[in-house]
UniProtKB/Swiss-Prot annotation:
Pfam families given in the database record: DeoC
Protein name per its UniProtKB record: Deoxyribose-phosphate aldolase
Cystines in this chain: none
Xref: HAMAP family: DeoC_type1
Gene Ontology MF, one: deoxyribose-phosphate aldolase activity
Active site: residue positions: D89, K152, K181
Keyword Transport among record annotations: no
Pathway: Carbohydrate degradation; 2-deoxy-D-ribose 1-phosphate degradation; D-glyceraldehyde 3-phosphate and acetaldehyde from 2-deoxy-alpha-D-ribose 1-phosphate: step 2/2
Lineage: Bacteria, Bacillati, Bacillota, Bacilli, Bacillales
């Protein structure tokens, strides 16, 4: 598998414009990225632009705080799928995890998984920078129990992004059959190779073109 096919080509900034989405989808076609990862408002346009392409549309749910109710997250998924999303990256209820309310954390994830089943792949963002190692392990275990397809490190909108150490811990926790996505601060081919070596099977990056072309990203980006 090429590096491009492991990258979710990402544009999640709040000031993203239509022109930027059109560029993003054009680049996805050109380079063969796994997906474009966009905010829900851009799912329909992205799906139209990628009709017939190998790249699919990924969107974010309960993003970036994860503090919506399970019912709201479930509706977001339903709406996203209707608009053409084939993958959804949801943020867990981080406060509930901190409170050791594992039942709520699981119910929250399961609400998304149940709606997406058979229609969209689910990635669960645990926001590693806010968690202890014990919490990272527990979050991954709950996500697997709830039926996720992937666990993912970060939103790119908090205090830190992906590290090789966190990827290795997540991979060890979920085993070989669940995907692990590294996101947040992955900007170069070397960064990607480090994450893959640690156990990542998907990369979230706004610097996708720079990564596959070997050029330096135009400017640093958290995502």
């Amino acid at each position: 598998m090429t590096i491009a096919k492991m990258i979710d080509h990402t544009a999640l900034k709040p000031d993203t414009t239509k022109e930027q989405i059109l560029t993003l989808t054009k680049e996805a076609r050109e380079y063969g990225f796994a997906s474009v990862c966009v905010n829900p408002t851009w799912v329909k346009l992205s799906a139209e632009q990628l009709a017939g392409a190998e790249s699919v549309v990924c969107t974010v749910i309960g993003f970036p705080l994860g503090a919506n109710t399970p019912e709201v997250k479930a509706f977001e998924v339903k709406d996203a799928i209707q608009n053409g999303a084939k993958e959804v990256d949801m943020v867990i209820n981080i406060g509930a995890l901190k409170d050791k309310d594992d039942e709520l954390v699981e119910r929250d994830i399961r609400a998304v998984v149940d709606v997406a089943k058979g229609k969209a792949l689910v990635k669960v963002i645990i926001e590693t920078c806010l968690l202890t190692d014990e919490e990272k392990v527990r979050a991954c275990e709950i996500a697997v129990k709830a039926g996720t397809d992937f666990v993912k490190t970060s939103t790119g909108f908090s205090t830190g992004g992906a590290t090789a150490e966190d990827i290795a811990l997540m991979r060890k926790t979920v085993g070989p059959n669940i995907g692990v996505k590294a996101s947040g601060g992955v900007r170069t081919k070397e960064d990607v190779e480090k994450m893959i070596e640690a156990g990542a099977t998907r990369i979230g990056a706004s610097a996708g073109v720079a990564i596959v072309s070997g050029e330096k990203p135009a400017k640093p980006d958290n995502y």
